[in-house]
Amino acid sequence: MSSGGLLLLLGLLTLCAELTPVSSQIRPAFCYEDPPFFQKCGAFVDSYYFNRSRITCVHFFYGQCDVNQNHFTTMSECNRVCHG
């Protein structure tokens, strides 16, 4: 293969890597768990969870029950951990 062909192949592979959707990236398993809705162990606080069907972080009121880890204090933290 010529050097031009190799450069073209390398460019295409780089482009494909950049276009890989976030949904195919690996997320922690707890991002796919349901958040602890309607469970009250303390005061309800504004929180965010990763909604696996919408593939985005969503606001909810967290009752402070540590059922799983799919709850975050900020949208940016949720996005960083689960959305990519």
Curated annotation (Swiss-Prot):
Compartments where found: Secreted
Cross-referenced CDD domains: Kunitz_MitTx (cd22610)
Expressing tissues: Expressed by the venom gland.
UniProt superkingdom: Eukaryota
Pfam families registered for this protein in UniProt: Kunitz_BPTI
Disulfide bonds: 31-82, 41-65, 57-78
Matches recorded under SUPFAM superfamilies: BPTI-like
List of residues that carry Pyrrolidone carboxylic acid: 25
Primary residence: secreted
GO MF annotation: an example: ion channel regulator activity
Leader peptide range in chain numbering: 1-24
Domain called BPTI/Kunitz inhibitor: residue spans: 31-82
Keyword terms, alphabetized: Disulfide bond, Ion channel impairing toxin, Protease inhibitor, Proton-gated sodium channel impairing toxin, Pyrrolidone carboxylic acid, Secreted, Serine protease inhibitor, Signal, Toxin
Transmembrane intervals: none
Cellular component aspect of the GO annotation: extracellular region
Secreted keyword on record: yes
Annotated function: MitTx, a heteromeric complex between Kunitz- and phospholipase-A2-like proteins, potently, persistently and selectively activates rat and chicken acid-sensing ion channel ASIC1. Both alternatively spliced rat isoforms ASIC1a and ASIC1b are activated, with a higher potency for ASIC1a (EC(50)=9.4 nM) vs ASIC1b (EC(50)=23 nM). The rat ASIC3 subtype is also sensitive to the heterodimer, but with a lower potency (EC(50)=830 nM). On rat ASIC2a, the toxin shows a very weak activation, but produces a remarkable potentiation (>100-fold) of protons when the extracellular pH drops below neutrality.
Domain comment, as recorded: The toxin-channel complex has a triskelion-like shape with one toxin heterodimer radiating from each ASIC1 subunit. Toxin subunits protrude from the edges of the channel trimer, with each heterodimer interacting almost exclusively with a single subunit.
Miscellaneous note of the record: Negative results: the heterodimeric toxin does not affect ASIC2b, ASIC4, Asic2a-Asic3 heterotrimer, Kv2.1/KCNB1, Cav3.3/CACNA1I, ENaC alpha/beta/gamma (SCNN1A/SCNN1B/SCNN1G), TRPA1, TRPV1, TRPV3, TRPM8, P2X2/P2RX2, and 5-HT3/HTR3A channels.
Quaternary structure, from the entry: Heterodimer of an alpha (Kunitz-type) and a beta (phospholipase A2 homolog) chains; non-covalently-linked.
Family: Belongs to the venom Kunitz-type family.
Protein name (database record): Kunitz-type neurotoxin MitTx-alpha
Source organism: Micrurus tener tener (Texas coral snake)
Organism taxonomic ancestry: Eukaryota, Metazoa, Chordata, Craniata, Vertebrata
